[in-house]
């Protein structure tokens, strides 16, 4: 309740939390004194709502550890709109690192696709409180002989302003152990004369997708009655075999 002298103006302030839609405020004034211009006793003002949407993204690996080369696993990317407005033109982007090969991409609430390891998901609008998911299935490689770690980050953007952009990325890390497949083949002449020196060969191969480290091969030459003594400096060799590599060695013995 106020008392206003002739020509006096008093200004008051008020606050409110902006709604998702436009807001209209109406002020009225009355007095017990006769008012000769009652048409200006009501004033209206409008405020347009600028949409904002707090998007966040998280990324989870189905199997962060215990993977081996050539195995498969999946990443789940979850986008949440905490509002308060609908997020327009939402795009999820993920560049899967080399060493992980994208096999398939699918979306729940998102249109999904990929160009090689460049994965994306889009939706024209994501309502406040809504969730959308992008799933990426990958195969894993490791051509070395040590366990590797891969870090993969997904991000989300929208044409609607985001008041909290710090939660617009999500990261998952996975490890991949090497997996080799070593094999050996030994050959001898089909026939040899007793007392002669015979040459044989032994090959060591790696048919796996990872490097085989500290490969030890040996050849024991013998008959049904026992081992024959061979000549040379030894019959054991330590090797490193890269994927697809074959090494062939020779050995001799007296028949």
Language-model features and meaning:
Residues 1-255:
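Exported/extracytosolic protein signature
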């Amino acid at each position: 309740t106020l008392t206003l002298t002739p020509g006096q103006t008093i200004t008051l302030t008020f606050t409110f939390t902006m709604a998702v839609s436009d807001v209209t405020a109406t002020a009225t004034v009355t007095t017990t004194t006769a008012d000769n211009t009652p048409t200006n006793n009501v004033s209206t003002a409008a405020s347009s709502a600028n949409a904002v949407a707090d998007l966040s993204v998280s990324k989870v690996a189905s199997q962060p550890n215990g993977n081996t080369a050539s195995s498969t696993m999946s990443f789940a990317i979850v986008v949440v709109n905490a509002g308060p407005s609908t997020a327009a033109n939402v795009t999820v982007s993920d560049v899967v690192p080399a060493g992980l090969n994208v096999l398939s991409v699918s979306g729940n609430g998102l249109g999904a696709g990929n160009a090689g390891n460049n994965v994306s998901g889009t939706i024209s609008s994501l309502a406040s409180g809504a969730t959308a998911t992008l799933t990426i299935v990958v195969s894993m490689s490791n051509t070395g002989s040590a366990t590797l770690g891969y870090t993969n980050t997904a991000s989300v953007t929208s044409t609607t302003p985001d008041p909290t952009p710090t939660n617009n990325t999500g990261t998952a890390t996975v490890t991949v152990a090497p997996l080799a497949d070593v094999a050996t083949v030994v050959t001898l002449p089909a026939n040899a004369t007793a007392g002669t020196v015979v040459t044989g060969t032994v090959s060591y191969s790696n048919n796996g997708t990872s490097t085989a480290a500290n490969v030890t091969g040996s050849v024991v030459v013998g008959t049904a009655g026992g081992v024959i003594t061979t000549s040379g400096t030894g019959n054991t060799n330590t090797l490193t075999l890269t994927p697809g590599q074959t090494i062939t060695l020779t050995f001799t013995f007296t028949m």
